[in-house]
Each structure stands twice: as C-alpha cells, then as structure tokens.
Amino acid sequence: FSPPSSQNPAVIDCLIVGGGPGGLTAALYLARFRRSCMVIDAGSSRASWIPRSHNYPGFPPGINGNDLLARLREQARGYGARLEQGRVEHIEPHADGFSVRYGDATCVTRRIILATGIEDTLPDMPDVEQAIGEGKVRLCAICDGYEVDGDNVAVYGEAENAISHAVFLRTFTDRVTVVVHGEPNACDQAFALAEHYDIRV
C-alpha cells in the first residue's frame, strides 16, 4: 500500500457510492489510511429497515439499524471521511481518474468503490414496511434465521431461490412453507430438495 499521493488535492483519492455498513466501513479504513475519501449516500440502506440486528459484532444485546448507521457515520467522520447525501447519476473517465456527477454537484476521484448493496422487491401486501419494522417480515434468511426458531415461516419469492432459502431456514424451524411469486418454475432438483426437507411449496 503506497503512501498518500501528493498530487492535486482537489482530486479525491476514493469516492464510495453507497452509505450502508459496507460503504461506511470502507470510508473508515480509507480515512485511517490517510486517504481523502467521500461517501455519496442516497439514504436507502437496507440497514435502516432493521428493527434490531443481533449479528453485528460488538453489540451483544443487538442494535437498531439506524443506530448502527449513525455510529458508523460518526466514526468515519471522526477520521476525516466526507459524507454527502445524493444519488450518483453519471460517471465518466477523467485525466485524473473519474468525473462523477451527483445531483447538482460534480467531483473528480482517482478510484471508486461501489457499495450500493441490493434493492429488495417487496411483496405486494398491505403495510409491508411497518411489518418489516416490527420484524414480522424479514428480508434476509442469513441475518434473521436465528430469530425464527421454531416458528411458522413462509418464504416468498421465485420458486428455485425461495426453496434454497427455505432449506437453509430448516436449520431453525421445521415449519417452512414456500409461497411462490408467479409460476412455480423450478428444476426437478429444487422440488426434490423441498420434498426431502418436508417443505411445502
């Protein structure tokens, strides 16, 4: 890892697109490596939906997603990371790296980290956002499997992917049903797996 550049200080060493836990952790490390960095955050991190996360290290009783984001922002800022609200709309090559437009502003950066995460397709049901906030609807089997211990669980989604998640959730409960979005098109192997683990489709 080379020492910080002494080139044009108006050029950011690294721009991070996305202000969720991944993007903010990258900003923290870059700032501690004495690199100039900026996070552009559209404010739509999945973490903000989490009522309480129990699998983020260092918080034994768990932590609310928005509280976690606030702590990560504070820590990154404390080392000099710059955090901006906005949505990146255009990136193009530049003599010093890349020119990036976000909202009415532009910046030039030597490197870019894309930490945009994923965007969930929410089920078409009333009050789904409230249900997520209450922990009744969950978006991540890996993150939340432990919390469904012994409960009745419905996995909603495209058949093959939903069956895969349902098999994982059988680690925590034997009462798993797959609710298929659209036609139940899945390979024979996926249906055989569901039958083997006594998962209703």
What are these regions (language model features)?
Residues 42-45, 119, 159-160:
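Short glycine-enriched loops at secondary-structure junctions
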Residues 48-106, 185-199:
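N-terminal Rossmann-like dinucleotide/flavin-binding domain of flavoprotein oxidoreductases
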Residues 11, 16-39, 139-188:
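Rossmann-like dinucleotide/flavin-binding elements
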